[in-house]
């Protein structure tokens, strides 16, 4: 088992991973609130932790992966009422849709997917423990709040000082006169008319959002576990509040390592329904093969913000198609012949990239070089070497969950064919990128852009007057 480093959000640096139990990793990732179809931001979180777990398991780690489902929430109640259906009908439908989307993206199912409504008793036990310890208090209206000033380390994950904080619009913090401090957060909400509720020592009601994850994670993995993950938007207040209530309740450190996946912007702007640039996974799959979406996500480092656009998806399709063409060229000559003797130099370079905070951008660069060597070996009819390189490439793409479809079926797929046609403006933009690359003497990038355009039906010709282009016949 090769040692690896990961970026711990709490420490704000890359650190070497040390397991609580030798050879084992317990991981909890915040899942979806199931009131609508999953969007591309959800896709990134699902895919990122999927390839991370695939890689760790390929290294011999025994990973226990928990991803929760929030099936009781203000948004769920509102949507069910708008639709005139029960909460269970709504959540069941969108849980099924979520699982279908995840499967289409090539994501393995988590070892366990606890639902919030299945852990109400455990949530109440944790809340009662916090009240008994003086870290939480019941309000006169039946709500129960966590008292943030009673937890000295509050703000350590997000790097915020309590006195400097200001509530943000997206922070899901209820502002109530019953609070002792503006940042006290609700653990138990009193029952309201036409809302689901459960009996409790504080009256009928339902759990707050944050307590759900603390109860589910500790019930599934214990009071102290290895890795907690989620989207960057959850760092504050959700994960900050999880730490406070969990550690105040158990008296133990909650999590050793925090991992957060970066944002997805759409055409340079934050994805938002109000901006009209909000896309569900299903929206995107109408234009692009789901493995193209996965490739787009895998090709960037999980912590880096990425820009989602049709151009980016077209580039992803072109790049992914290269691997399929290489596999097809090999299979036409050698069939499905493989060998257990893999090229260890490529394996080592790939593993080194992934062991450095799961650097898939660097890992993909290794795969492109390997793909190029495979094409050369097939062209030069070097059968033994071609088989080793093909087997190595297949092994490594499997770890990333790529090139998982039948070669001919993928290449014949018409998903996204209309979207693949580059506009004139997009072509001119690529040409300018190529000019800039040549000026910087980055000839490899310049050649890559030329080849990418050629594969998309655009022919470049360099003349004394500059580069001209035409669409291939």
Swiss-Prot record:
Domain of life: Bacteria
Localization terms from the record: Cytoplasm
Protein's UniProt keywords contain Acyltransferase: no
UniProt EC number: 6.1.1.16
GO annotations of cellular component type: cytosol
Positions occupied by motif 'HIGH' region: 32-42
Positions occupied by motif 'KMSKS' region: 270-274
SS bonds (residue pairs): none
Residues that, per the record, bind Zn(2+): 30, 213, 238, 242
GO MF term set: ATP binding; cysteine-tRNA ligase activity; zinc ion binding
Keyword match Transmembrane: no
Cofactor descriptive note: Binds 1 zinc ion per subunit.
Required cofactor(s): Zn(2+)
Enzyme class at the top of the EC tree: ligase
InterPro entries: Cys-tRNA-ligase, Cys-tRNA-synt_Ia_DALR, Cys-tRNA/MSH_ligase, Rossmann-like_a/b/a_fold, tRNA-synt_1_cat_dom, tRNAsynth_Ia_anticodon-bd
Subunit note: Monomer.
Family stated for the protein in its record: Belongs to the class-I aminoacyl-tRNA synthetase family.
HAMAP family found in the cross-reference section: Cys_tRNA_synth
Name of the protein this chain belongs to: Cysteine--tRNA ligase
Organism listed in the record: Acinetobacter baumannii (strain ATCC 17978 / DSM 105126 / CIP 53.77 / LMG 1025 / NCDC KC755 / 5377)
């Amino acid at each position: 088992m090769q040692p690896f480093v990961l970026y711990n959000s709490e420490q704000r640096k890359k650190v070497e991973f040390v397991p609580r139990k030798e050879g084992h990793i317990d991981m909890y990732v915040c899942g979806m609130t199931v009131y609508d179809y999953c969007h591309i931001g959800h896709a990134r979180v699902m895919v990122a932790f999927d390839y991370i777990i695939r890689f760790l398991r390929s290294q011999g780690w025994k990973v226990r992966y928990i991803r929760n489902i929030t099936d009781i929430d203000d948004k769920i109640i509102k949507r069910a009422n708008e639709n005139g259906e029960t909460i269970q009908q709504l959540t069941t439908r969108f849980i099924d849709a979520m699982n279908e989307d995840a499967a289409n993206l090539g994501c393995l199912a988590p070892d366990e997917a606890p639902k919030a409504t299945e852990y109400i008793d455990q949530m109440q036990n944790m809340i009662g423990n916090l009240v008994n310890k003086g870290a939480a208090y019941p309000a006169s209206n039946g709500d129960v709040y966590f008292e943030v000033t009673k937890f000295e380390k509050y703000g350590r994950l997000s790097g915020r000082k309590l006195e400097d904080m200001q509530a943000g619009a997206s922070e899901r913090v209820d502002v109530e006169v019953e609070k002792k401090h503006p940042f006290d957060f609700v653990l138990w909400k009193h029952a309201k008319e036409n809302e689901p509720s459960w009996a409790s020592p504080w009256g009928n009601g339902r759990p707050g959002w944050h307590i759900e994850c603390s109860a589910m994670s500790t019930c599934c993995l214990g009071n102290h576990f290895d890795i907690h993950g989620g989207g960057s938007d959850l760092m504050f207040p959700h994960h900050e509040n999880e730490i406070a209530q969990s550690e105040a309740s158990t008296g133990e450190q909650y999590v050793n390592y925090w991992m957060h996946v970066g944002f997805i912007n759409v055409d340079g702007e934050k994805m938002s329904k109000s901006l009209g640039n909000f896309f569900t996974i299903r929206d995107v799959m109408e234009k692009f093969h789901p493995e193209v979406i996965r490739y787009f996500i895998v090709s960037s480092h999980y912590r880096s913000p990425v820009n989602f656009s049709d151009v980016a998806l077209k580039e992803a399709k072109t790049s992914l198609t290269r691997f399929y063409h290489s596999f097809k060229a090999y299979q036409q000559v050698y069939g499905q012949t493989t060998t257990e003797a893999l090229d260890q130099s490529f394996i080592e370079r790939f593993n080194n990239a992934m062991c450095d905070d799961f650097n898939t951008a660097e890992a993909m660069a290794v795969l492109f070089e390997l793909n190029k060597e495979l094409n050369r070996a097939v062209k030069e009819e070097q059968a033994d070497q071609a088989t080793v390189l093909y087997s190595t490439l297949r092994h490594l793409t499997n770890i990333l969950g790529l090139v998982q479809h039948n070669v001919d079926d993928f290449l014949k797929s018409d998903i996204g064919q209309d979207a693949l046609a580059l506009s004139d403006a997009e072509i001119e933009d690529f040409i300018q990128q190529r000019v800039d690359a040549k000026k910087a003497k980055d000839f490899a990038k310049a050649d890559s852009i030329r080849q990418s355009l050629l594969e998309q039906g655009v022919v470049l010709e360099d003349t004394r007057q500059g580069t001209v282009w035409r669409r291939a016949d």
